[in-house]
């Protein structure tokens, strides 16, 4: 079946087929090679892209900006403090204004409904840079990174996610693995598993792709034999620091430490994290937590010894944000 990525939204990956996802991964690989070899051609000259950030960002903003600049496009960074979004103007009205000026819009913020509304009224492609429910651009980077660090075909790669699985990373890792036929293990307290309706949707995709989906409360069982171990921060952006106490109590058994990495039984296993990570007490938040919980001074969701070890490929994963976002922009906006 033929497909056309031109002028497509990227909101959750829910509506992208396996073939389309594989195409984006292959294009990401090709664009990365072209950048490394100095043979990249610009396909987005005279294109203008708006970047709306209601949540702060390092990797997503830099990845979109560099990807666009490499391809000859212009970007405008918009945050709530420097615009009328949410103050004097609704997202619906913002969409109808920006859609007349820009060729595409990226949104990073809170509820999925907001980016869906933006896509409904903008009239141009909209890309989800992160919402509370999904992180689709991160997923493409994660799978590209796993493919680069494994000599197995995608359907033979296994990975585990440990931690709060109700968030955008838990949801998205389950979804993309289900779409691509991978072996996905989610380890979390049952109260922090993805919602039942979402899991049911992913199981339907898994039936079509041959994916294996496992949800368990046992972290060591989850990581047994896996190729990659993923985690994320235990409190998401926007949640108060006061929420840490109960979450730490719930999630401490799911901390990625050397014991967990060795429990994989796979000497080639790698550690992945979408970043930023609280792996020591050198950040403001890390210091706050260490003062309250001295046993976490050497890492919260991941320990310092794992993060600074050869297990860690999170920085290559971060670089791949730019290559995969570039593939999204080119496949959607380029006149080729």
Swiss-Prot record:
GO molecular function: amino acid binding; ornithine carbamoyltransferase activity
pH dependence: Optimum pH is 7.3.
Compartments, as annotated in UniProt: Cytoplasm
Gene Ontology CC annotations of this record: cytoplasm
Catalytic activity entry: carbamoyl phosphate + L-ornithine = L-citrulline + phosphate + H(+)
Biological pathway: Amino-acid degradation; L-arginine degradation via ADI pathway; carbamoyl phosphate from L-arginine: step 2/2
Effect of loss of the gene: Cells lacking this gene are blocked in the arginine deiminase pathway.
UniProt-listed Enzyme Commission number(s): 2.1.3.3
Binding-site positions, L-ornithine: 168, 232, 236-237
NCBIfam families named among the record's database cross-references: orni_carb_tr, PRK01713.1
Other comment: Proceeds by an ordered sequential mechanism with CP identified as the initial reactant.
Family: Belongs to the aspartate/ornithine carbamoyltransferase superfamily. OTCase family.
Function: Involved in the catabolism of arginine. Catalyzes the phosphorolysis of citrulline, the reverse reaction of the biosynthetic one, yielding ornithine and carbamoyl phosphate which serve to generate ATP from ADP. This catabolic OTCase does not carry out the biosynthetic reaction because of a poor affinity and a marked cooperativity for carbamoyl phosphate.
Protein's name according to its UniProt entry: Ornithine carbamoyltransferase, catabolic
The species this protein was found in: Pseudomonas aeruginosa (strain ATCC 15692 / DSM 22644 / CIP 104116 / JCM 14847 / LMG 12228 / 1C / PRS 101 / PAO1)
GN (gene name): arcB
């Amino acid at each position: 079946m033929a497909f056309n990525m031109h002028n497509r939204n990227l909101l959750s990956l829910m509506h992208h087929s396996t073939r389309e996802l594989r195409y984006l991964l292959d294009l990401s690989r090709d664009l990365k090679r072209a950048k490394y070899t100095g043979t990249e051609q610009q396909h987005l000259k005279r294109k203008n892209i708006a970047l709306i950030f209601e949540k702060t960002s390092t990797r997503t903003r830099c990845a979109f900006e560099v990807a666009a600049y490499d391809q000859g496009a212009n970007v405008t960074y918009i945050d709530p403090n420097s615009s009328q979004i949410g103050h004097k103007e609704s997202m619906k009205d913002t969409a109808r204004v920006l859609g007349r000026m820009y060729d595409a819009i990226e949104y990073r913020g809170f509820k999925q409904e907001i980016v869906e509304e933006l896509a409904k009224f903008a009239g141009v492609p909209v890309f989800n840079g992160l919402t509370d429910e999904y992180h689709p651009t991160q997923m493409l980077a994660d799978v590209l990174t796993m493919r680069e660090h494994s000599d197995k075909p995608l359907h033979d790669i296994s990975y585990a996610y440990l931690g709060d699985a109700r968030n955008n990373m838990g949801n998205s890792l389950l979804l993309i693995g289900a779409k691509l036929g991978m072996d996905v293990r989610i380890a979390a307290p049952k109260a922090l598993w993805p919602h039942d309706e979402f899991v049911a949707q992913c199981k339907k995709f898994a039936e079509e792709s041959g994916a294996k989906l496992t949800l368990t409360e046992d972290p060591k069982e989850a990581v047994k034999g896996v190729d990659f171990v993923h985690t994320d921060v235990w409190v998401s952006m926007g949640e108060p620091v006061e929420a840490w106490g109960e979450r730490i109590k719930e999630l401490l058994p799911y901390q990625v430490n050397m014991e967990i990495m060795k429990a994989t039984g796979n000497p080639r296993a790698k550690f992945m994290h979408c970043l930023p990570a609280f792996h020591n007490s050198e950040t403001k938040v890390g210091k706050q937590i260490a003062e309250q919980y001295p046993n976490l001074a050497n890492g919260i969701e991941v320990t310092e010894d794992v993060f600074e070890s050869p297990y860690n490929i999170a920085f290559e994963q971060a670089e791949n944000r730019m290559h995969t976002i570039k593939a999204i922009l080119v496949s959607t906006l380029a006149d080729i």
